[in-house]
Amino acid sequence: MAKGTRGKPSVIRPSYDDDSGSDGELANVLQARDEPSDGDDDDMDSISFGALNAAQRKLDQKASKKKGGKAQRRRSDGDRDNSDDSDGDSDGSEEEGDFFETSDDNDQGYNKGKSSGRNPRKQVQKKKSKHAPSESSSKRPVSKVRDIGGLESKSMYRDIRFDPAYGKANLDEVRKNYSFLDDYRQQEVQEMEQVLKKDRNLSHFNKQKLEFKVQSLKSRLDTLNNRDLENKILSEHKKEQLAKFKSGSQANPYFLKKSDKRKLIQKAKFDNMKTSQREKVMERKRKRRLGKEFKELEFNRH
């Protein structure tokens, strides 16, 4: 040192070394804090953020021992972030932001965690009331296959004889194989009609229920019989046309149109009806015809 020069404390240059290499700087900083001098402001400007951060961590550790470890839990999360920012690879701006971070935010976060008693992320939200709808996270995707409320559940058992996956069912063959069920249906209708006649102690509700079942079974039997009659008429016509074609009396077989099929079926049904049924059908047709005529008259007046 030259003569006449004033003695100055050693200047600490800014550096971004690891915490292990900043022990000497830490000792100088602590010593400089206790010994005031004229160049304190200049020295503080030249101290690295890593050294200041390490010094702050040392002071916090000492304070936590006196307060029973409460301050250590409060600043544990902030210390982890600050230790990462003090590495040599981190930027100076990031270190400065972490260093000047206020302790109010940490205190608020600590109070929130202390009041809840557990991690708020893991805490399950409770329903406001038992009648409130259940809540689910919107971040979890909804499954593609799910049950819809109000619809009937799928049957657990399936009859492969009527399963469309095994091909289209032959209704004529099914009707032929299960035609014996008509006898059971007819017998059931007769038994329910006898109950309605003999049992007079039936309630109004049970009586209406039995009448509805009788009417439903009768209409089902009529539908099956009409379908059998239609199939029978069409098959007989087809056989007749093929016989004429084979005998040579007809050049080509004649295939009926839908309108011709409808007329042929109606004629066959009318022939097989009883007298009372025919009268009802004729009366229904007459009323329908009169209604059409009245509508035409009203339209012509306007």
Curated annotation (Swiss-Prot):
Region Disordered: list its residue ranges.
1-154
Keyword hit for Transmembrane: no
Q: Name one GO biological process term.
A: maturation of SSU-rRNA from tricistronic rRNA transcript (SSU-rRNA, 5.8S rRNA, LSU-rRNA)
Q: Where is the composition biased (Basic and acidic residues)?
A: 74-83, 144-154
Superkingdom of origin organism? Eukaryota
- Quote the biased-composition stretches of kind Acidic residues, using this chain's numbering: 84-107
Q: Alphabetically list the UniProt keywords.
A: Coiled coil, Nucleus, Ribonucleoprotein, Ribosome biogenesis, rRNA processing
Q: According to the UniProt entry, which residue ranges have a biased composition of type Basic residues?
A: 64-73, 119-131
Location within or outside the cell: Nucleus, Nucleolus
Tagged with keyword rRNA processing: yes
Task: Identify one Gene Ontology CC term for this UniProt entry.
Answer: 90S preribosome
Question: Which residues fall in a coiled-coil region?
Answer: 206-228, 277-298
Subunit description: Associates with 90S and pre-40S pre-ribosomal particles.
| Biological role stated in the UniProt entry | Component of the 90S pre-ribosome involved in the maturation of rRNAs. Required for early cleavages of the pre-RNAs in the 40S ribosomal subunit maturation pathway.
UniProt record similarity statement: Belongs to the RRP36 family.
The protein's name in its UniProt record: rRNA biogenesis protein RRP36
Organism whose genome encodes this protein = Debaryomyces hansenii (strain ATCC 36239 / CBS 767 / BCRC 21394 / JCM 1990 / NBRC 0083 / IGC 2968)
